């Protein structure tokens, strides 16, 4: 049975902790002594042109924050975010998201219309992340949405319309070059009589439109704001579209002489996405299909296939595969704040969230022999409630702020899915699974899980002379997901700040406007690697056997019980400061941090018996991250007619896997020091003794390239070219295994990242240019490895230049390992604020933008902006799955009434 924290257990624990120290209210984070990267989004959204995802606004505007599209599919709205790198192997690395006080996630944030967001605040430091206890180790993104202003009735409307054009595509042999190469090599190539570029066949000019309407009204005592947003995107890949509709209402009411403030909000969104079912098959087929084959069906209604090619299908036929997603999200929340005394506030907050996600897939019989259909539905409900008591008072040279808070979070998830094959007709798609011939064993399932988290929080902040500040925080979390022996965990932090500018010895330095120093140390946790039933013995069906002539399902253990399982703990130290000169027209910030993750989760091989299963998830490993973040901004020109502003953030980050060995209940446990985590495989990978490329190695950054070293090419007896591999161990034999003749030759994660913005205003005209960059990392060009392989020709088409190279070797080596450094011009926007003289129209703005303007890089592939941050099998590997790079041209209009 699922173990819950009962309300009386929660209250008793809260009372016990409260006797020792005051607690802290989550809603009062802003009272802490912390330095946060705050990104106001209004101008960012307006200047960036087409913005389909709220996280696009954050990308490049906060030091140490990296936003990456999931996988290789840039049509998807969902992104992955890393704050100061990776802190766990199997635990969650996406930051916690708090939207107007409501606990959320990256997926939900991606559905919010960007213009609804007033600002992001990224919490990274020790004192900041410790506030969120067992969920703060990967950083926290606080999102503040817009509210009514109480300035009377107002209406605003914004729209952007854009076209997307492919900016770069693979240069494969044309039909004429394909036939000429086959003739020159003396090999037979089937001539279908057509001349096709299949990338052109499956792509189109994309079209995207965004519309946003908001109105607000009321007075300072009672106000409201409502907004509606719609995004419609016809992507550059034919038949693949998505749209998103969002609605949001907020009401604020003051009562009893402003002693009581109530805030009520409702948010809802619906999202539909016609995604690509098999990204690799689609784009690999488009590149490598015989260019003389027809783009559509032949005269008999059949598709022309090459039966000798592995995972190659006519690209237009692959487009008929469907992978559709429908998601609905609803949230309502209420906050009440009552002023008990001039220095004492009592607040209560509650929220309810509901998510429904439907996934449907269909593969027709002309792609898969028996066809394939899938339907699944996933639902989630969340309840959140907290009560806090906050005190703030100043007397003389002293100031004190303190708070108490308790919180309870409950989550429930259900799911059902089924998969079938043996399609009678393709006409039904995925809408009539009953018409299929079979449902494979294990392809139908359902789940139910729930989890709860109880929290107690404390905060005290003391300020002397309004320039020396000391802050102490403590959070205790009790989770139903961890082991019985570790139900509660405690996460303290301490931080200090010195406002040097207010010192007497700087009173004569008028050029210095701001000078602050700060430091902090704290603990935070990570529950991401633990699900609802991870600590228990789990079983699942293993087969069907006859019992008394009745088919009976057999069950087997799939997980060991671990009552000692707990959250990972990250300890962070940071020190930094900021200086502002000449009325802060020149600002410089710098911060160094070091964090160490201990009790890191990892799955270990264990003996059976005494264990019931051969794997055990345990808290044993350790990992470190350290870095330096620098921020710079300058406003060199500020006049009535001209404003020029330049800002930049630069982050240096170093990760290290410290250990995977340790002790569990008196038993020494360890994992392999070298483990492959990413490979070149799938379509087009013909030959090669060991295709592993990316590894986790103890003592190295997580995700390094561990490859044989190629010293050049040599011509074999047949006159073809192969890679000459260095014999590192000098044993006379080239070993492509995971040791011997391999060496560490770079990392997939950038050592440094850059974000920069230049904005210029001349009278009513303005211009904004955003640049992002990443440096110090490598990319394995698996696409070039596969598409330059002449041993697969003419079954597969190849890139131009491949026949001249005549390489027939498919073994991986550092020959195709390239520098991944790049500087990307993210967007350029030029606009005009139209002068208006009207009692109705308050402002009118028109603009034109180009997104993904240009990229400066030495990388030879389509784009260096692949997954370089999320540790998975695709990290740092360009492996034929790349979504086409495209450029967006858009115009925008914003009007306020």
Predicted regions, residues:
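Extracellular/periplasmic, surface-exposed regions of secreted and cell-surface proteins
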Residues: 206-209, 244, 250-256, 264-270, ...
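Short aromatic-centered micro-motifs
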Residues: 97, 393, 462, 704, ...
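C-terminal beta-barrel architecture of Gram-negative outer-membrane proteins
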Residues: 732-733, 766-827, 862
């Amino acid at each position: 049975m699922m173990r819950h924290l009962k309300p009386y257990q929660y209250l008793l624990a809260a009372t016990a902790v409260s006797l020792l120290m005051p607690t802290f209210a989550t809603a009062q984070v802003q009272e802490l002594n912390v330095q946060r990267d705050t990104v106001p989004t209004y101008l960012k959204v307006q200047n960036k042109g087409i913005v389909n995802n709220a996280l696009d606004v954050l990308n490049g505007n906060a030091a140490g924050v990296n936003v990456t599209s999931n996988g290789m599919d840039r049509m998807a709205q969902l992104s992955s975010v890393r704050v100061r790198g990776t802190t766990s192997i199997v635990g969650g690395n996406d930051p916690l998201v708090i939207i107007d006080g409501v606990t959320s996630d990256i997926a939900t944030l991606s559905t919010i219309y960007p213009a609804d967001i007033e600002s992001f605040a990224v919490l990274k430091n020790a004192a900041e992340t410790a506030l969120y206890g067992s969920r703060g180790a990967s950083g926290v993104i606080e999102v503040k949405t817009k509210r009514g202003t109480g300035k009377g009735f107002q209406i605003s409307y914004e729209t952007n319309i854009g076209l997307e054009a492919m900016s770069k595509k693979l240069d494969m042999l044309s039909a004429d070059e394909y036939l000429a190469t086959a003739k020159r090599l003396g090999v037979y190539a089937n001539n279908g009589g057509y001349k096709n570029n299949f990338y052109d066949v499956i792509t189109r000019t994309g079209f995207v439109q965004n519309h946003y309407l908001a109105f607000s009204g009321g007075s300072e005592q009672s106000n409201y704001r409502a907004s509606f947003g719609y995004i419609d995107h016809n992507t550059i890949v034919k038949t693949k579209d998505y749209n998103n509709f969002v609605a949001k209402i907020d009401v604020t009411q003051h009562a009893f002489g402003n002693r009581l403030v109530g805030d009520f909000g409702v948010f809802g969104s619906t999202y539909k996405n016609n995604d690509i079912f098999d990204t690799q098959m689609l784009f690999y087929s488009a590149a490598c299909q015989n260019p003389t084959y027809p783009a559509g069906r032949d005269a008999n209604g059949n598709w022309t296939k090459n039966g000798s090619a592995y995972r190659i299908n006519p690209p237009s036929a692959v487009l008929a595969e469907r992978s559709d997603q429908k998601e609905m999200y609803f949230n309502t929340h209420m906050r009440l704040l009552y002023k008990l005394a001039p220095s004492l506030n009592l607040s209560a907050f509650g929220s309810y969230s509901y998510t429904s996600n439907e996934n449907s897939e269909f593969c027709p019989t002309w792609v898969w022999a028996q066809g394939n259909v899938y339907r699944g539905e996933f639902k989630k409900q969340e309840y959140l409630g907290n009560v806090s008591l906050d005190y703030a008072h100043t007397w003389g040279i002293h100031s004190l702020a303190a708070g108490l808070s308790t919180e309870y979070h409950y989550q429930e998830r259900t799911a059902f899915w089924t998969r079938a094959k043996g399609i009678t007709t393709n006409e039904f798609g995925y809408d009539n699974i009953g018409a299929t011939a079979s449902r494979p064993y294990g392809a139908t399932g359902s789940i139910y899980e729930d989890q709860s988290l109880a929290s107690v929080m404390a905060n005290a902040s003391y300020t002397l002379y309004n320039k020396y500040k000391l802050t102490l925080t403590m959070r205790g979390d009790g989770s139903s997901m961890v082991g019985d022996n570790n139900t509660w965990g405690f996460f303290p932090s301490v931080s200090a700040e010195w406002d040097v500018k207010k010192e007497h010895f700087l009173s004569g330095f008028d050029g210095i406007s701001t000078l602050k120093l700060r430091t902090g140390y704290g603990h935070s946790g990570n529950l991401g690697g633990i699900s609802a039933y991870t600590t228990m013995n789990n079983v699942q069906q293993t087969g069907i056997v006859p019992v008394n002539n009745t088919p009976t399902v057999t069950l087997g253990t799939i997980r060991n019980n671990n009552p000692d399982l707990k959250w990972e703990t990250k300890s962070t130290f940071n020190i930094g400061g900021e200086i502002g000169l000449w009325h802060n027209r020149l600002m410089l910030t710098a911060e160094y941090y070091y964090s160490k993750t201990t009790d890191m989760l990892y799955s270990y091989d264990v003996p059976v018996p005494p264990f019931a299963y051969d794997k055990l998830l345990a808290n044993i490993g350790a990992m470190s991250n350290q870095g330096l973040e620098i921020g710079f901004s300058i406003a060199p020109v500020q006049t009535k007619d001209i404003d020029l502003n330049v800002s930049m953030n630069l982050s240096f980050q170093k990760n290290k896997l410290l250990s995977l060995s340790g002790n569990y209940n008196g038993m020494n446990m360890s994992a392999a020091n070298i483990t492959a985590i990413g490979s070149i495989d799938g379509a087009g990978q013909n030959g090669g003794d060991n295709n592993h490329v990316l590894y986790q190695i103890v003592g190295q950054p997580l995700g390094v390239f561990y490859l044989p070293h190629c010293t050049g090419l040599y011509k074999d007896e047949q006159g073809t070219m192969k890679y000459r591999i260095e014999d590192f161990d000098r044993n006379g034999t080239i070993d492509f295994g995971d040791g011997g003749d391999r060496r560490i030759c770079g990392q997939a994660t950038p050592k440094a990242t850059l974000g920069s913005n230049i904005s210029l205003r001349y009278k009513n005209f303005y211009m904004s240019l955003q640049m992002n960059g990443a440096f110090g990392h490598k990319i394995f060009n698996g696409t070039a490895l596969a598409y330059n392989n002449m041993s697969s020709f003419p079954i597969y088409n190849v890139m131009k230049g491949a026949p001249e190279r005549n390489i027939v070797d498919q073994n991986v080596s550092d020959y195709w390992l390239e520098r991944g450094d790049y500087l990307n011009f993210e967007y350029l926007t030029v606009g005009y604020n139209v002068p208006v003289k009207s009692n109705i129209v308050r402002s009118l703005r028109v603009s034109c933008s180009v997104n993904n303007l240009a990229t400066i890089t030495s990388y030879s592939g389509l784009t260096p902006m692949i997954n370089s941050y999320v540790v998975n099998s695709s990290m740092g590997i360009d492996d034929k799955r790349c979504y086409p790079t495209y450029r967006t041209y858009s115009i925008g209009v914003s009007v306020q009434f």
